[in-house]
C-alpha cells in the first residue's frame, strides 16, 4: 500500500476548502487556517485519514468484501466509473442516485433484471421485429436504465462498503447506508458533517485532480487486497 505524501496532496489542491461562510463547524478540527476567506484543510490529517481508509479497504478487499463508489457530480462522474471498474469487487453510481437503491433492494433488483432482459432482446434483434413505436419505447427505456444502473448491473447483493464523493449532494445515499449499517468512506469538504461517515477524508471534493488522487489511492489498496 503506497501512501500519498503531502506534496502530492498539495499539488492536487486537496487542501482548498470552501468559502469560510459556508463551513460546517464540525469540520473545525480538520481546518488548518483561513486565507482570503477560503478555508484551508490540514493535509497532515488528510494524509493520516487516507492512510487509515486505505488500510481499511485493503483489509476488506482481502476478506472478499464488495465496494460501491458513488459520485454523480460532473467532476466525479467519469473518475468514479473508471476507478470502480479497476476493482474486481467494485460497483458504481455516477449519474443520479435513485432513492431506495439500497433500502428498497428488491425493487432495484427487479429494475436490474429488466435492464438485462432488454439488453438480451437488443442483442437478439428482438427490437427489429417490433412495431416502430414499441421498438422506440424499449430503446429509450434501455438507454435510461443503462444510464442509471449500468454500474450496479452485476451487483448481486448489498455492498459491504460505500465510497462517496460529495456528502452534501449524495446525502440520500449516505442516509441509506447508515440505515443499513454499510460503512461509509467519504471525501469531506469544509461544508460537510464528519459525524455522518465512518472514515472521513478531509479534502477538496470539487476539483477533479483532488478527487482522482484520493480515489486512485483507495482503488490501488482495494486491488492489492484482492490479490
From Swiss-Prot:
<keyword id="KW-0689">Ribosomal protein</keyword>
<keyword id="KW-0150">Chloroplast</keyword>
<protein>
    <recommendedName>
        <fullName>Small ribosomal subunit protein uS2c</fullName>
    </recommendedName>
</protein>
<dbReference type="GO" id="GO:0003735">
    <property type="term" value="F:structural constituent of ribosome"/>
</dbReference>
<dbReference type="InterPro" id="IPR001865">
    <property type="entry name" value="Ribosomal_uS2"/>
</dbReference>
<comment type="similarity">
    <text>Belongs to the universal ribosomal protein uS2 family.</text>
</comment>
<dbReference type="GO" id="GO:0006412">
    <property type="term" value="P:translation"/>
</dbReference>
<dbReference type="GO" id="GO:0005763">
    <property type="term" value="C:mitochondrial small ribosomal subunit"/>
</dbReference>
<dbReference type="GO" id="GO:0009507">
    <property type="term" value="C:chloroplast"/>
</dbReference>
<dbReference type="Pfam" id="PF00318">
    <property type="entry name" value="Ribosomal_S2"/>
</dbReference>
<keyword id="KW-0934">Plastid</keyword>
<dbReference type="InterPro" id="IPR018130">
    <property type="entry name" value="Ribosomal_uS2_CS"/>
</dbReference>
<dbReference type="InterPro" id="IPR005706">
    <property type="entry name" value="Ribosomal_uS2_bac/mit/plastid"/>
</dbReference>
<dbReference type="InterPro" id="IPR023591">
    <property type="entry name" value="Ribosomal_uS2_flav_dom_sf"/>
</dbReference>
<keyword id="KW-0687">Ribonucleoprotein</keyword>
